[in-house]
Amino acid sequence: MAVAAAAAAGPVFWRRLLGLLPGRPGLAALLGRLSDRLGRNRDRQRRRSPWLLLAPLLSPAVPQVTSPPCCLCPEGVHRFQWIRNLVPEFGVSSSHVRVLSSPAEFFELMKGQIRVAKRRVVMASLYLGTGPLEQELVDCLESTLEKSLQAKFPSNLKVSILLDFTRGSRGRKNSRTMLLPLLRRFPEQVRVSLFHTPHLRGLLRLLIPERFNETIGLQHIKVYLFDNSVILSGANLSDSYFTNRQDRYVFLQDCAEIADFFTELVDAVGDVSLQLQGDDTVQVVDGMVHPYKGDRAEYCKAANKRVMDVINSARTRQQMLHAQTFHSNSLLTQEDAAAAGDRRPAPDTWIYPLIQMKPFEIQIDEIVTETLLTEAERGAKVYLTTGYFNLTQAYMDLVLGTRAEYQILLASPEVNGFFGAKGVAGAIPAAYVHIERQFFSEVCSLGQQERVQLQEYWRRGWTFHAKGLWLYLAGSSLPCLTLIGSPNFGYRSVHRDLEAQIAIVTENQALQQQLHQEQEQLYLRSGVVSSATFEQPSRQVKLWVKMVTPLIKNFF
């Protein structure tokens, strides 16, 4: 008992000490990192071993596939059925899935969907920018809300927006001030929730400067939902994401069950967030523990229950729904079945929502991603992309220790979102170069250059923010699975932030071709990384950046 108490007290001690260090970001980062390590027994057990080829054996076992009578997919349709043991499984026709390719297409689709929304608009993002394009989006919302009130038969249109508190409150003009007019004009229809991480509290919250407080933890989910249609993306609601910041986007059209799930998920996170008021103050939901003034353990426990209730109830609901569907279908005549098929095509594509909220002890995305990497067999190809190359130790070990081929796409320094930034932030691209070089050196030292290849995205006048993966089974020229959403595969995504993405599994060749073309378009703008890459003058990393990077890499 005493040992457990001492272990639990360790992180508290370091964080209290951290709070006494104003103006010393380097030392503060060091102590914060020590605090994290003291509290992460699981991660310590995963530290790199020289026996890298044993990585598949050391990784989590694939969850056992069960075959309840209510399962959506008959055995053998696809090998990823085990995911349904963790999350709800949504079967859809591939004709309802469209892959978008550009920021402009993303922006125009959002505006168009807002204009025709009748029942609900739900938007979750890190922040809303303050420029003219963002104002155009707000104006679309205002116009649609106005029409809903003036219609002959007024609709019950509701708008729910979830943003991060720290990022959305930065500066005098910010996400909050952009949304206040909507909130004041339509108080019964508009809800704005601002998530505040429970780990930013006390002296730490008072002393960390505005821009740096975001490193402690964020609301990072990106979901844009209009009635029964959903866009899943990694893009934020900001002008660059509408013009020249490359990301990924998938549009799920008329998928009511998926839209219901993400509405409930955003509502759940919204309920444990601070509620923006018309006077620009914030309030906690009645009966909810305050995220940074209340007891942290109690708050996290309540948040875990709220989110897991959504996941588990949706999973049960889907099982029951599909059990009824299959039972009904078995009683239909051939003509009835054909007629039913005209109304709702048989599913050839399966959607799995993967949620990662480590502050609330929810690690579904981490489990699924590690299992996918573990199970990728010899001859399979994994195309993995991230705008910020900073893989967790577990992901790195799996890439280096398993048998599939990997092509990893990352941002060249010039298209990194921090390139040219003022102050300390301007050194972040160099820190990523340092991390990239260390990983490349390890690949070479293990003789894995043929199996694991790094590629850098470059496009004049653009930045790069795409993340996710495409999985090609051995012998296949098209992907059967993709992960798309907000996670970056880095420490922050796994441990600090709230994340959501979806796994799309499809046997439809046309949709597989869409995903393949998406992958090809991104990789075509890249160059292969070699030893010569790091000899270029632009890749020289200053000594102080090399020294600081290990101390701060868990914060970005």
UniProtKB/Swiss-Prot annotation:
Range of residues in the leader sequence: none
Organism for this UniProt entry: Homo sapiens
Gene Ontology MF term list: ATP binding; calcium ion binding; CDP-diacylglycerol-glycerol-3-phosphate 3-phosphatidyltransferase activity
PROSITE patterns (alphabetical): PLD
GO cellular component: endoplasmic reticulum; mitochondrial inner membrane; mitochondrion
Domain of life: Eukaryota
Modulation of this protein's activity: Activated by calcium and magnesium and inhibited by other bivalent cations.
Transmembrane segments annotated in the record for this chain: none
Gene name of the encoded protein: PGS1
Family (UniProt): Belongs to the CDP-alcohol phosphatidyltransferase class-II family.
Catalytic activity: a CDP-1,2-diacyl-sn-glycerol + sn-glycerol 3-phosphate = a 1,2-diacyl-sn-glycero-3-phospho-(1'-sn-glycero-3'-phosphate) + CMP + H(+)
Domain named PLD phosphodiesterase: residues: 215-241, 460-493
Pathway as given in its UniProt record: Phospholipid metabolism; phosphatidylglycerol biosynthesis; phosphatidylglycerol from CDP-diacylglycerol: step 1/2
Function: Functions in the biosynthesis of the anionic phospholipids phosphatidylglycerol and cardiolipin.
Any one GO BP annotation for this protein: phosphatidylglycerol biosynthetic process
E.C. designation(s): 2.7.8.5
Binding site for ATP: 124-131
Cellular localisation: Mitochondrion
Keywords for the protein's UniProt record, in alphabetical order: ATP-binding, Lipid biosynthesis, Lipid metabolism, Mitochondrion, Nucleotide-binding, Phospholipid biosynthesis, Phospholipid metabolism, Phosphoprotein, Repeat, Transferase, Transit peptide
Name used for this protein in its record: CDP-diacylglycerol--glycerol-3-phosphate 3-phosphatidyltransferase, mitochondrial
Top EC category: transferase
Active site per the UniProt annotation: 220, 222, 227
